[in-house]
């Protein structure tokens, strides 16, 4: 007997929101000089200046988050990403103006989930998806993410490149919406 999953529209989406911050770029050259006592000339020869524009934000989360409780119900056979976006979190001490870090400082990036020593790219964005207050990400296929999100701990990572160096930390929320699919027998019960 071949079982078909319940249509996606039958269940409300599961929404995961995670606050992240891209810290102020100290400058790779300066941090290496401070940490290792290297001379500036040696550093200039070995480090590409564009490395200062690479960012990585990650947060390790428990699989027991209340927003993920629907994943533990009987009969859930698949979880797929429906939508993903980044939302800017303005710094109340620094109103929008010159020198304010917004999402427009980003150039491109990807979103990954990691659990049980396995990592999967689930969404990405490029210049055309970026606005000062939000970034719409494009899904990278529709892989089943159930085992990632049901694990004891999983890591959400956003990484990519900036257009320019940040003058202040950049705070934002990564918001992921997931569709659940149920085994038809469990849906009827």
Where are these regions (language model features)?
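N-terminal leader/pro-regions and domain N-caps
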Residues: 1-49
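A short, solvent-exposed, low-complexity linear motif enriched for acidic/polar residues
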Residues: 1-6, 12, 47-49, 109, ...
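One face of beta-strands
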Residues: 14-20, 59, 77, 84-86, ...
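Beta-strand elements of well-folded, non-transmembrane domains
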Residues: 22-26, 83-92, 113-119, 160-166, ...
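A short beta-strand-loop element at or near the start of a globular domain
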Residues: 30-85
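Short amphipathic, basic-aromatic surface patches that mediate peripheral association
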Residues: 67-69, 89-99
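Short, surface-exposed beta-strand/strand-loop-strand elements in extracellular ectodomains
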Residues: 94-118
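Cysteine-clustered segments with highest specificity for TGF-beta superfamily mature ligands
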Residues: 123-182
